[in-house]
Amino acid sequence: MKTLQDYIDKLNKLNFKEMYENDFFLTWEKTDEELEAVWTVADALRYMRENNISTKVFESGLGISLFRDNSTRTRFSFASACNLLGLEVQDLDEGKSQVAHGETVRETANMISFMADVIGIRDDMYIGKGNAYMHEVVDAVTQGHKDGILEQKPTLVNLQCDIDHPTQCMADMLHIIHEFGGVENLKGKKLAMTWAYSPSYGKPLSVPQGVVGLMTRMGMEVVLAHPEGYEIMPEVEEVARKNAEKTGGSFRVSHDMADAFKDADIVYPKSWAPFAAMEKRTNLYAEGDSEGIKTLEKELLAQNAEHKDWCCTEELMKTTKDGKALYLHCLPADINDVSCKDGEVEATVFDRYRDPLYKEASYKPYVIAAMIMLAKFADPAEVLKKLEEKEIGRASC
């Protein structure tokens, strides 16, 4: 059983000074020690909450959330993270704001940020748009702070864009670290990031891209498996290849789900839309081509239906390492005969892994809180120490 001091000591050995007053866009833009700092602070905050130690580092302030796509886990994880640190959350509903009347990104970003310490954005639907929008928001608030309009520049946390889903993948990784007993035990472990059938179309690429972009940094043997025609962004594949070369791991693409699952230590079967189709979809929306969008949707649904055999079955799970691979999913999963007739995973597999799946999801609030804390405090180790010394209980009578 670790103590809070153990986490503080570990934090003091890491170099993460560039995270202070900075933003979190993509995991591969961060150093290994910066990622380690996020996991360490996340674990420290979890330890504190579980041991009734207050983690309130803000007496006031706002966490602004903007979701341009549906969300349950990430929405509540962001709200939980802000609350954990003492911030209140205000959700920006663009449909009810002046954005609907043509307000510029620069103006909106500054107007919502007068007392904001963090802005969390999900914008994952359109290739080439989401991450770019987040940078535009950061540029606006940076200039606002420089011009003396804003007292402080709120940090931005990417809650999922068109390229990466860093809070999800960092939470996934922290779950893996705990399941395998430390980062040092991950080298050589086989992870299968595989496409799986879904009766819906247009699921973002950011989860598989985020997974291969992060897991390849751990010296793991990462296999990206999908039917032909379901490629991810080529630049992310290149990131994964370079990571694998640097860490002594491996990265390869397979068009065989069974090949990916064979002897795998970790499996992550999840549906996504082809990069080429998502790119075409973005262009059709930009052109206002509603008929073209409908046609593309029919084509993609028909294409998906050709690959219903890409499902995480009991038989496939038996072929994994000792038949006991760790099953991951960002949730919600398409479960056979539960949420749909045919989907990503058989019900018996999902039911067997339900508890670890929920545990996997539970890391996300702490990961987000850690990202915020590392961006807002120059010496988070000292902040954690002072919180412990105050001896204020989170819940006290």
Model-derived features with residue positions:
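Glycine-rich phosphate/diphosphate-binding loop of Rossmann-like nucleotide-binding domains
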Residues: R68-S80, I177-E291
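Positively charged, low-complexity intrinsically disordered leader regions
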Residues: M1-F76, S80
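Conserved small/polar residues in nucleotide/adenosyl-binding loops
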Residues: A395-C397
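Phosphate/diphosphate ligand-binding glycine-rich loop within oxidoreductases
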Residues: K56-I177, I335
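Rossmann-fold NAD(P)-binding glycine/threonine-rich loop
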Residues: I293-Y358, Y366
